[in-house]
């Protein structure tokens, strides 16, 4: 398959404690997850023989923030200049590291003709309630140094009830700082138990996360109608656990470990089928599960059916994130 988008979780570590983050949830429950960073040498090994000239790299992830990874700058250089990727989009809360680090990234962005750019996850103009443990003052110091060095920036603003009235102010601030502005509505924030509420999430689907999750787990639907990013957009996800998944959602399903669905998959087709320590990216993508079984398993009667596919991407993708870049 053509790999158009690769999302890479460079770290499972983070300075923040966002209430909706899987890492925060696992920490609060005292549950295990791998606390680690991907190494530059691993990135080189995995991608050495793959043509990435038409590929977008997304540095984001489920658990951590890429700026925690000590090899980050080397990895960015590798993708930009050795692999000559189309572009690199890095998402960060921006609340840590020294100013020299951010100046360096700004120069990297400028000198790459802005093929490297940053999505700053800042959810408010004067307050940043969702990003717990993150100093907004420190964030703006880092943003300003990066921008002044010539870095390309997008301010990504998740709409919550507490910050909805500040959207116009944030838009104006972004303009003054030379940043693009993007609002983001995420249906997962329509949870009965969400600490930070979002009316905007209900515009995506009025049903709560728990209601749809219950229907998915009970297989209470006739046709899944999966809008799969892997199949439609040619997207793959690599987690810090060195597993290659079609998307971040199935990786999240694995680390959350709420059900036996992923363990059932491993039991039936082998625990190492998507393990990058055992197989190359090409070998994994040519496996029977990726080529045929994944799509077949969207049928809720299939023995390897994973309800998470319906929960996040079913009903023709109606619960997908809505992102509007201005």
What are these regions (language model features)?
Residues 6, 10, 14-15, 65, ...:
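Generic structural signal for small/hydrophobic residues in well-ordered secondary structure
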Residues 1, 151-154, 162-255, 301-318, ...:
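A C-terminal junction/extension of Radical SAM enzymes
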Residues 37-60, 69-186:
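Radical SAM/AdoMet-radical enzyme domain recognition
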Residues 1-4, 24, 28, 243-244, ...:
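Flexible mid-to-C-terminal extensions adjoining Fe-S/redox cofactors in radical SAM and related proteins
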Residues 19, 66-67:
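A short, conserved beta-strand element in the Rossmann-like catalytic core
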Residues 4, 53, 232:
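Exposed loop/turn and edge beta-strand positions of beta-sandwich/beta-sheet ligand-binding modules
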